[in-house]
Amino acid sequence: MRRLLSLMPVLLALTACGGGGHVPAPVTGKPDAGCLPGDRGYLKAKFRGALESEPDWHGGELQCEGGARPDGSGLRVSFLGPPGAHGERLRLVFGIDAKPGTPRSRAVPTNITVIVEGGKQLYATQGADKCQVETMLQEPLPLPDGAARASSMRDYRIAARGACIDPASSLDGSARLYIDRFDFAGTARFADNELYAATSSR
């Protein structure tokens, strides 16, 4: 979480040049440590251009977190991979135009930010017209046996896959990152009043 907060001045700069795109704000609630139990959390992707990489992260090597966008326009999920050969770490942030808690979604516009932590690189689609989540499932995570619900927050498993038709770019526009595909399952924490069932009944 501290790493993501330290990147916020750069991320916020995207607001001014992003053509109306959503910039991922820090996620509150679930700490940036671990993901889902076992191998239920994962991220797979294929990058070309500025980065030649095919992340395939599972289980304990993956950290994830998520929540609702502050403006109520959808949800976001963040993934942090394991350290590379030189200590750099790759973070992906997905901003998805779907209501929190919606069980199933298809063809959802999505904004993606890719950050190389320790490498001073950031690429963003700067808008939701370049990438699309083809399918997405949101399912509430059960409480541990015998545990009582102590707050109005609920944890969800978010599983999605999709692709991009146009590349992400560096802040100065000099580099392009092509995201051929992505497939992930992570977590998000929502307040009761942020969930689809609550907002749709108003």
Where are these regions (language model features)?
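C-terminal motif of bacterial Sec signal peptides marking the signal peptidase cleavage site
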Residues: 13-16
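Surface-exposed beta-strand edges and their flanking turn/coil or helix-capping segments
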Residues: 92, 172-175, 197-199
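An ectodomain-focused feature that recognizes extracytoplasmic/extracellular
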Residues: 21-133
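Acidic, glycine-rich flexible loop segments
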Residues: 106-188
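Intrinsically disordered, low-complexity acidic/polar segments
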Residues: 54, 167-171, 193-195
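Short, low-complexity, Pro/Ser/Thr/Gly-rich segments in the mature regions of secreted, periplasmic
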Residues: 185-202
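A periodicity- and composition-biased signal for non-globular, repetitive helical segments
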Residues: 8-9, 50
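Bacterial N-terminal signal peptides that target proteins for export
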Residues: 1-8
